[in-house]
């Protein structure tokens, strides 16, 4: 009898446990459905405060969707998305670009916005994973007080002996702006536009000599050094350079006459996002005429939608020559090789 009672108790406990776990499974499915219908969105962003403040409140007002914004650096955010891939806590990653994320595209959902048709030809979503929304091209920031009448219009001008030791440049192995500036000079000086050609790297050798060993530790030090008059010219992003112009500093922004690179500041939908439809609405909103034009008129990032008006402190789009053969996917695949070549040429210059 005692044995039967024990057996009954065990079976009862097993039944309860099974019911509990079955209930948990059912609740998870219900939770997913509830989450999908919620008017909320979690955005992981590494963008500037000004850009976040332009886009997020406007999106909330227009859609009624509440945005939970997590702000951090690009590296930590990408690591977070990767660590959460089996149970995504975020819906959108608003950081980095294809060059940085190509090898991790399995972390993201394929989505091409209907607004993609309205973007510049070089800024369309060609992969399905990365949606270019704005661009921060690499430019020259020229201190007009120091440059005087000196011609600084393109990469050949940077080899002027008068600029030796007066060029602010970072380390392409550690600085994203320096790496993109390196890519621009490689495409500009490469034979038939080939960034791996001997001609491209011969130019790099001469450029390294004119920098005269003064490679800076951060992107910020480059544009600040030029604006403060420590250097005559710096190779940097357009955003900070245009900000100095906007604020009245004695500098000007120069897009190299040989060509410019427009790395798209992309937005990605996280694979398995709990609020997938809201995430798609966010991407659509980012590319909309309203937001692209507002950014062009008030900020110093470059909108990528066709026909958008820009503030007078921004260089008009029709005055910028773009490299037609620039391939962001190719650059992403060959980045390690290019950085290794840079390090090799830098080391050779010191011997």
Question: What spans do the regions from the language model cover?
Answer:
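A ligand-binding cleft/hinge motif common to bilobed small-molecule-binding domains
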Residues: 99-103, 227, 232-250
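Short beta-strand->loop
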Residues: 109-117, 130-131, 156-159, 249-261, ...
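Periplasmic-binding protein-like
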Residues: 136, 203-208, 215, 245-271
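Short, low-complexity disordered leader/linker segments with a strong preference
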Residues: 1-40, 349-351
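Mature extracytoplasmic/periplasmic domains
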Residues: 260, 265, 270-325
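Extracytoplasmic ligand-binding site segments that recognize negatively charged/polar headgroups
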Residues: 45-52, 72-76, 82, 88-230
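Short, polar/charged alpha-helical segment
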Residues: 41, 45-66
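Extracellular/periplasmic bilobal clamshell ligand-binding domains
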Residues: 312-351
